[in-house]
Structure formats: C-alpha cells, structure tokens
C-alpha cells in the first residue's frame, strides 16, 4: 500500500491550532487544488468529542465558505479527520495560510453565534447519517478554543519524518 502524504509528517511535533498545506496538485485543465490540514488539537494529546466535531462539521462547512470563497478560491469539501484532531479542507485555488487562518477564526466566531441546536443545518434523518449525534455546546466549546487561540502555521519541511524513520515505521 502506498504511503499517503499525511503520514510522512511527524505528528508528535505538530502545533495546534494550526494551518498546514497538506497537498497541492494541478488538474488536467490547469486548476490548482490545495488540501489544507486544519489542526484543532495536538495529535495524541487532545481529541475533539464526537458529538461536537459532528455538529462542527455541519456548521463549519457553510461558515468557512462565507469567509474564504471568492478571489480565486472555492472550497470543494471540509471533512473531519478520523483521529478527531482536525479537518481536511480541499479547495480550488492557492490561498496563503494566513488567509485560511483568518477565515477559520471568523468561521468559529460564527459558530459561537448559533443560538439553538435546531439552527444546525441538515440536522434531520434525511440529510444526516447520525442526526441524533450532535452537541451545539461541544461544538461551541471547540470554536471558543480556536477564537481564544493564536492559529499557527505548520510547515511540511519542519515536520517531515526522516527517510530512515519512515522505513522503520513502514509495514
């Protein structure tokens, strides 16, 4: 099995909250696609609660588009990481990390303004696969942590695992 890009960086040295360009690619038609690692928690130290991250997934997707889309950028998808320490965001365009960080913080401020769980988009059995697994309170606690924090920038070169370590770890 090929080694995926996300597993070539040292998770023990990742700062959080922080933005990282996880991958860039060009489509056959010349469009730039960028995948960002939006790291909410330090890997293996913190984890977002499942109800909170699920609610945040519903809210974050729209709010982030409100703040980041435009001027050569269009978000394709924002999805939570299985490890529950962050989200991956795929988009068309190449915004710099600071623009992404500023939009992320603004989106989290919007999450804090949601007054009632009934205002969570697509919170019903027809549009959500686990519609009863939500917590606005937990989502807002996660959002408050981001609003209260400085969002850093994780650089791939600073986090790269050495080739000998990758060889040792690869199964």
UniProtKB/Swiss-Prot annotation:
<dbReference type="GO" id="GO:0009372">
    <property type="term" value="P:quorum sensing"/>
</dbReference>
<feature type="binding site">
    <location>
        <position position="128"/>
    </location>
    <ligand>
        <name>Fe cation</name>
    </ligand>
</feature>
<comment type="similarity">
    <text>Belongs to the LuxS family.</text>
</comment>
<keyword id="KW-0479">Metal-binding</keyword>
<comment type="function">
    <text>Involved in the synthesis of autoinducer 2 (AI-2) which is secreted by bacteria and is used to communicate both the cell density and the metabolic potential of the environment. The regulation of gene expression in response to changes in cell density is called quorum sensing. Catalyzes the transformation of S-ribosylhomocysteine (RHC) to homocysteine (HC) and 4,5-dihydroxy-2,3-pentadione (DPD).</text>
</comment>
<keyword id="KW-0071">Autoinducer synthesis</keyword>
<dbReference type="InterPro" id="IPR003815">
    <property type="entry name" value="S-ribosylhomocysteinase"/>
</dbReference>
<dbReference type="GO" id="GO:0043768">
    <property type="term" value="F:S-ribosylhomocysteine lyase activity"/>
</dbReference>
<dbReference type="InterPro" id="IPR037005">
    <property type="entry name" value="LuxS_sf"/>
</dbReference>
<comment type="subunit">
    <text>Homodimer.</text>
</comment>
<keyword id="KW-0673">Quorum sensing</keyword>
<dbReference type="Pfam" id="PF02664">
    <property type="entry name" value="LuxS"/>
</dbReference>
<keyword id="KW-0408">Iron</keyword>
<feature type="binding site">
    <location>
        <position position="58"/>
    </location>
    <ligand>
        <name>Fe cation</name>
    </ligand>
</feature>
<protein>
    <recommendedName>
        <fullName>S-ribosylhomocysteine lyase</fullName>
        <ecNumber>4.4.1.21</ecNumber>
    </recommendedName>
</protein>
<dbReference type="GO" id="GO:0005506">
    <property type="term" value="F:iron ion binding"/>
</dbReference>
<feature type="binding site">
    <location>
        <position position="54"/>
    </location>
    <ligand>
        <name>Fe cation</name>
    </ligand>
</feature>
<dbReference type="InterPro" id="IPR011249">
    <property type="entry name" value="Metalloenz_LuxS/M16"/>
</dbReference>
<keyword id="KW-0456">Lyase</keyword>
């Amino acid at each position: 099995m090929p080694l995926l890009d996300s597993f070539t960086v040292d998770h023990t040295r990742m700062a959080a909250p922080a933005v990282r360009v996880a991958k860039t690619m060009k489509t056959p038609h010349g469009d730039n696609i960028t995948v960002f690692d939006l790291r909410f928690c330090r890997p293996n130290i913190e984890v977002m609660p499942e109800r909170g991250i699920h609610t945040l997934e519903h809210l974050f997707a729209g709010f982030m588009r409100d703040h980041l889309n435009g001027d050569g950028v269009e978000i394709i998808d924002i999805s939570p990481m299985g490890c529950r320490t962050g989200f991956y965001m795929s988009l068309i365009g190449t915004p710099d990390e600071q623009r992404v960080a500023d939009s992320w913080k603004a989106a989290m401020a919007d999450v804090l303004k949601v007054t009632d769980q009934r205002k969570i988009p697509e919170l019903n059995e027809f549009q959500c696969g686990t519609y009863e697994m939500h917590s606005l309170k937990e989502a807002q606690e996660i959002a408050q942590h981001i609003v209260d924090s400085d969002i850093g920038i994780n650089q791939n070169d600073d986090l790269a695992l050495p080739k000998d370590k990758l060889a040792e770890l690869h199964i």
